[in-house]
Amino acid sequence: LSALGAVVVKSLSPDPWAGNPSPRVHPVAAGMLNSVGLQNPGIDAWLDEELPALAATGARVVVSIWGQTAGDYGRVAKAIARASASANANANARGSANANASARASGSASGSASGRARAGASDPTTQTGRVPAAPPAPPARSIVAVEANVSCPNVEDRRRMFAHSCAATAAAIGEAAEALAGTGLPLWAKLSPNVTDLTEVAAAALAAGADGLTLINTLMGLALDPATGRPRLGGGGGGLSGPALHPVAVRAVFECRAALPDAAIVGVGGISTGEDAAELLAAGADAVQVGTATFADPRAPARILAELERWCGHNGITRLADLIGRAHE
């Protein structure tokens, strides 16, 4: 984990959500379809019950959030903001306590030394001050960013995906951005490729307060059992991910970088090798995420990072900055 930038958790909603019926995953050529349905315990339960174990590993955490209304994004973000503020307050209090303990320890040691000097001999019973070990940092201190997954049905717009509308995307991102104001946590908008012009939606997200873009979410797909005519997934259709999605992700990143040259972009989609990662970086991504590859290989992110380093060495690249956006030179 120390070699990775962060771990992105599954998307969290204001309240617990059961998700879709099984089967939820189906393999397809060069990837898979999934229809998990955003199952999660709800933001409060996750903060209390699951984040501590994740933080204990030393992981830096990106919290993915979703909602059924624009206001839901604000509710989840507010819970994160409260946890972050509480964690920072506790950290500041610990820092003050440790500073005071250090001062007391210093004073006690000096006083004891002076007493021994006056006595002309050391006193084995003299107590020197010790600084108590600092307690572990609050789990919420491990949160480094929030990612708003807007590829979700909007119940206020006939269940149309937020990410399929500039206005709906802006509304959801605006709610989250307002809730996170003052926390110092960057907000990323994770967008869908299932639109006519992704750059327009990306621009709307940035204008509404997103600090960066995560490109892209899955493509909508469907797998049928021809013998029965029934969908192979319990929820009907699903999202296509894996290597089959990679060229779509490269194009999305390339087009958004060209249209929005100052945007921070995280590229995701079908990365399974170091060269895949290099391709998204060359298209204009500032960083990348690895998802589906971890199903078959939980160590894929570390392996891909090592492969990327070797690829850069073989191609004479000494700084990733020289690779990022190379396709636009």
Give residue spans per PLM region.
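Hydrophobic faces of well-ordered beta-strands that scaffold small-molecule active sites
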Residues: V7-V9, V61-V63, A87-A89, V146-A148, ...
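N-terminal capping/small domains of soluble enzymes
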Residues: L1-V61, W66-G71
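Glycine/Thr-rich beta-alpha phosphate-binding loop at enzyme active sites
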Residues: M32, P153-A167, V201-A263
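Catalytic cores of alpha/beta
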Residues: Y73-R82, T196-A208, A258, I271-V288
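Glycine-rich phosphate-binding active-site loops on the catalytic face of alpha/beta enzymes
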Residues: V9-P14, V150-C152, L215-G221, G270-I271, ...
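Glycine-rich beta-to-alpha transition loops that act as phosphate-gripper elements at the mouths
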Residues: S64-G67, L191-D197, H246, A263-E275
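Alpha-helix-loop-beta-strand connector modules within alpha/beta enzyme cores
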Residues: D44, D48, P52-T57, S165-L187, ...
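C-terminal helical cap(s) of enzyme catalytic domains, especially alpha/beta-barrels
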Residues: N20-A29, L224-G237, T294-I317
